[in-house]
């Protein structure tokens, strides 16, 4: 998935105002949630073999948040990694040797999780994860359905490249 495709697809995520209001979510929180799926084009036209580099360099990702995933203001290349974002406090990066996306312990080169076989599949899978998380936040019983959440996490891992990636998405969904 290309950065531009990812940004356009995020705009299509259905934030259910009516159901969120029924849950007592404030109008401001609903607007904040909607803006967490928006990344405005900031120009520059950076071209890279890595869609994640194009995303961070060409779009304002300051409000973009998918689950616990956030994006940095700029790309930083250090050693064998291109750092592009965070999962909570830990670093998300593209491994320049393998091309895979990994989660590294904050400030260290220690890989905690393998996230995707490449950054294109990472964009595709976190888009799918965002859609599911949004649905799970408003549909009765979906959050508590551990079996379904495990199935979804494994499905997301398969989109990311296979069984090697299941653990990251299980952790992301809290199962």
Regions found by a protein language model. Give the residues of each.
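Charged, low-complexity surface segments at secondary-structure and domain boundaries
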Residues: 1, 18-21, 106-110, 137, ...
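A surface-exposed partner-binding patch
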Residues: 1-93, 159-175
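Long, low-complexity, intrinsically disordered segments enriched in glycines and aromatic residues
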Residues: 44-148
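Acidic, proline/glycine-rich low-complexity IDRs
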Residues: 134-175
């Amino acid at each position: 998935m290309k950065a531009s495709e990812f940004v356009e697809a995020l705009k299509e995520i259905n934030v259910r105002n009516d159901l969120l209001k029924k849950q007592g979510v404030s109008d401001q929180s609903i607007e904040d949630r909607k803006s967490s799926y928006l990344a405005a084009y900031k120009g520059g036209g950076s071209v890279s073999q890595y869609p994640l580099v194009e995303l961070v360099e060409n779009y304002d990702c300051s409000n973009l948040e998918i689950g616990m995933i956030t994006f940095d203001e700029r790309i930083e290349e250090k050693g064998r990694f291109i750092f592009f974002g965070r999962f909570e406090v830990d670093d998300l990066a593209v491994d320049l040797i393998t091309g895979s996306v990994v989660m590294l312990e904050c400030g260290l080169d220690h890989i905690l999780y393998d996230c995707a076989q490449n950054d294109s599949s990472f964009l595709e899978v976190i888009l799918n994860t965002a859609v599911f998380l949004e649905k799970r936040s408003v549909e009765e019983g979906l959050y508590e359905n551990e079996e379904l959440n495990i199935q979804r996490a494994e499905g997301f891992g398969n989109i990311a490249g296979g069984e090697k990636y299941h653990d990251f998405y299980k952790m992301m969904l809290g199962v």
